[in-house]
């Protein structure tokens, strides 16, 4: 076997391989012997068919199969010998084959980039320092009560957190516009669903009143014909409701899995959940900064084959989220996923190099801790932990998560990490 390697462009490579004629003939004869042992031909017992008849009937197809097998095996031998690491599936380009002559073919593919990590010491990471306070727990309890609230009709004026039922008709320069009219429209105040000024114009009014409010559509409004336009809305305020929060009774508290129904038990459960969310949020914030710094400090070439493969993964994930099938997934435009796919490949290559240079292996204690942390959010953590322990694929996925965390920590060990005190709500709002 003769081998030559050339660079085509960037990460592209072409390996040209020549297989000696006698190697081909030896492989063909060997395969014909195997075929002769299995075939049945009228007039001959199984395994007793003369070789010249076997060759006459099956020689062409056997030779084709043998050439395909030799091309594959010789390519693998060549890249091992040349220490080449292909990225993605190779493309085989066969030359002209003539019986009794050497056979030359080429294989085109991309290789993984050579990554030399740099700039780790210049990466800046700000780590949030946060404590879950009693006031934070109080706020979360209020949120839980609001989620379970009922609505009661009232006679008074509309306030910031009320709910209203309205008819409205919008117009610009005296002309009604498409989508600007609704009847019995239910609007929960304070959620920012409407354009600026709309809710403010309703506050202070009472049920039964009809009035007009003046607003201006934002410049970034989605409808081109309304961007930046002054508009009037004729409002018929039909009903005003106020929120009635449930009391923290034992019955209410037990809905959240607190068996003793006590306020203290609910506060403890809420605090535990908030601290788990907080730990995850801090970890994600630090990780995202470390990875962003790593990407900015290391500009690397990316094999197109890996990007294509990642685009296929993202397409299928998108189709699954929206209930589509594989055919519909492949019809989604690649432009929707190209940037995200490239970044995921870059991050994977860089973290892979961090893992390689630091000789990292998944810490089994960390894996165990991650599973326990994840399981604590479920009603029966022990059942979840046992389920994971018996599923090799899930365990391998969790080992990959642990290994990625270890790689990020290796980056952080060299980066400039500063601490900044903040509040639970500030951090969570930034995560949203």
Swiss-Prot record:
Reaction(s) catalysed by this chain's protein: [protein]-peptidylproline (omega=180) = [protein]-peptidylproline (omega=0)
Coiled coil: none
A GO biological-process term: 'de novo' cotranslational protein folding
Highest taxon of the lineage: Bacteria
Keyword tags: ADP-ribosylation, Cell cycle, Cell division, Chaperone, Cytoplasm, Isomerase, Rotamase
Gene3D superfamilies: 3.10.50.40, Trigger factor ribosome-binding domain, Trigger factor, C-terminal domain
Post-translational modification note: (Microbial infection) ADP-ribosylated by the phage T4 protein ModB.
Pfam families according to UniProt: FKBP_C (PF00254), Trigger_C (PF05698), Trigger_N (PF05697)
PPIase FKBP-type domain location: 161-246
GO molecular function: identical protein binding; peptidyl-prolyl cis-trans isomerase activity; protein folding chaperone; ribosome binding
InterPro entries in the record: PPIase_dom_sf, PPIase_FKBP_dom, Trig_fac, Trigger_fac_C, Trigger_fac_C_sf, Trigger_fac_ribosome-bd_bac, Trigger_fac_ribosome-bd_sf, Trigger_fact/SurA_dom_sf
Compartmental location: Cytoplasm
Modified residues (ADP-ribosylarginine): 45
Region span, Dispensable for chaperone activity, although its removal significantly decreases antiaggregation activity: 148-251
Main location class: cytoplasm
EC class name: isomerase
Free-text note on domains in this protein's UniProt record: Consists of 3 domains; the N-terminus (residues 1-112) binds the ribosome, the middle domain (residues 150-246) has PPIase activity, while the discontinuous C-terminus (residues 113-149 and 247-432) binds substrate and has intrinsic chaperone activity on its own.
Quaternary structure annotation from Swiss-Prot or TrEMBL: Homodimer and monomer. In vivo most of the ribosomes are in complex with monomeric TF; binding as a dimer has also been suggested. Uncomplexed TF is in a monomer-dimer equilibrium with approximately two thirds of TF existing in a dimeric state; binding to substrate PhoA induces monomerization, 3 TF monomers bind somewhat independently to a single substrate molecule. TF and SRP can simultaneously bind to ribosomes; TF binding is abolished when SRP is bound to FtsY in the presence of a non-hydrolyzable GTP analog. Contacts ribosomal proteins L23 and L29.
Family designation: Belongs to the FKBP-type PPIase family. Tig subfamily.
Protein name in the entry: Trigger factor
């Amino acid at each position: 076997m003769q081998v030559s390697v050339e660079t085509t462009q960037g990460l592209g490579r072409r390996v040209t391989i020549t297989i000696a004629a006698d190697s081909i003939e030896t492989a063909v004869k060997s395969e014909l012997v195997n075929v002769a042992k299995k075939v049945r031909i009228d007039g001959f017992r199984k395994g007793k068919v003369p070789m010249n008849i076997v060759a006459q009937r099956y020689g062409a197809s056997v030779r084709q199969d043998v050439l395909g097998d030799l091309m594959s095996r010789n390519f693998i031998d060549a890249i091992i010998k040349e220490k080449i690491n292909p990225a993605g599936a190779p493309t085989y380009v066969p030359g002209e084959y003539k019986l009794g002559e050497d056979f030359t073919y080429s294989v085109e593919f991309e290789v993984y980039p050579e990554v030399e990590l740099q700039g780790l010491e210049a990466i800046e990471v700000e780590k949030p320092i946060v404590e879950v306070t009693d006031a934070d727990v109080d706020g979360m309890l209020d949120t839980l009560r609001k989620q379970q609230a009922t609505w009661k009709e009232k006679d008074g004026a509309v306030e910031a957190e009320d709910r209203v039922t309205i008819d409205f008709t919008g117009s610009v320069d005296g002309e009604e516009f498409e989508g600007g009219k609704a009847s019995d429209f239910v609007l929960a105040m304070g959620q920012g669903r409407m354009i600026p000024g709309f809710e403010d114009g309703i506050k202070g009014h009472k049920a039964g009143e009809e009035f007009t409010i003046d607003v201006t559509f934002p410049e970034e409004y989605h409808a081109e014909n309304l961007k930046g336009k002054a508009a009037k809305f004729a409002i018929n305020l039909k009903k005003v409701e106020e929120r009635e929060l449930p009391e923290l009774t034992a019955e209410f508290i037990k809905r959240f899995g607190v068996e003793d129904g006590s306020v203290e038990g609910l506060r403890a459960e809420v605090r535990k959940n908030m601290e788990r969310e907080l730990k995850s949020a801090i970890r994600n914030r630090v990780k995202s900064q470390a990875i962003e710094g790593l990407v900015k400090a290391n500009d690397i070439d990316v094999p197109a084959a890996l990007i294509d493969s990642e685009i296929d993964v993202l397409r299928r994930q998108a189709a699954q989220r929206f209930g589509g099938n594989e055919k519909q997934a492949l019809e989604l435009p690649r432009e929707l996923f190209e940037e995200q796919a490239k970044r995921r490949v870059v991050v994977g290559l860089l973290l892979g190099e961090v893992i390689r240079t630091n000789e990292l292996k998944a810490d089994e204690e960390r894996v165990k801790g991650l599973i326990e942390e994840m399981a604590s959010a479920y009603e029966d953590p022990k059942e979840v932990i046992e389920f994971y322990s018996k599923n090799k694929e899930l365990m391998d996925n969790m080992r990959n998560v642990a290994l990625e965390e270890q790689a990020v920590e290796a980056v952080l060990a060299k980066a400039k990490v500063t601490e900044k005190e903040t509040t639970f709500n500030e951090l969570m709002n930034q995560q949203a």
